[in-house]
Curated annotation (Swiss-Prot):
Gene expressing this chain: erpA
Organism: Vibrio cholerae serotype O1 (strain ATCC 39315 / El Tor Inaba N16961)
Domain of life: Bacteria
Name assigned to this protein: Iron-sulfur cluster insertion protein ErpA
UniProt similarity note: Belongs to the HesB/IscA family.
Cofactor note: Binds 1 iron-sulfur cluster per subunit.
NCBIfam families: iron-sulfur cluster assembly accessory protein, PRK13623.1
GO CC annotations on file: cytosol
Cofactor: iron-sulfur cluster
Subunit note: Homodimer.
Binding-site list for iron-sulfur cluster: C41, C105, C107
Entry-linked Pfam families: Fe-S_biosyn (PF01521)
Biological role stated in the UniProt entry: Required for insertion of 4Fe-4S clusters for at least IspG.
Transmembrane segments: none
PROSITE patterns named among the record's database cross-references: HESB
């Protein structure tokens, strides 16, 4: 497990929403895990899930008492990015503002490098 300063940010809006969701689940040991999988219309897609486990090699990023966890394979595609949260006419969602993405699909759920 790594707790070094990494070039990946966890926005205040995302941390606030994660904190609210954790309170709803009544499980303070939950962390938000962001990961990359193959798929989507652009080759890779982002995934978000709650996790209670920090695996060997994972990187932890903290904001306002909330922890974001990223596995080493996913982190290489997220360097310089920002994990954020938005609410709007299209609904609410977590997303990644990723400077490494050379193309993204229209909804922003998948990307290529």
């Amino acid at each position: 497990m790594s707790e070094v300063n990494v070039p990946l940010s966890f926005s205040d809006a995302a941390a606030k929403r994660v904190k609210a969701l954790i309170a709803e689940e009544e499980n303070p040991s939950l962390m938000l895990r962001v990961y990359i999988t193959g798929g989507g219309c652009s080759g890779f897609q982002y995934g978000f899930t709650f996790d209670e486990t920090v695996n060997e090699g994972d990187t932890k990023i903290e904001n306002s008492g909330v922890i974001l966890v990223v596995d080493p394979m996913s982190l290489q595609y997220l360097i310089g990015g920002v994990v954020d949260y938005t609410e709007g006419l299209e609904g609410s969602r977590f997303f990644v503002n990723n400077p490494n993405a050379t193309t993204t699909c229209g909804c922003g759920a998948s990307f290529s490098v």
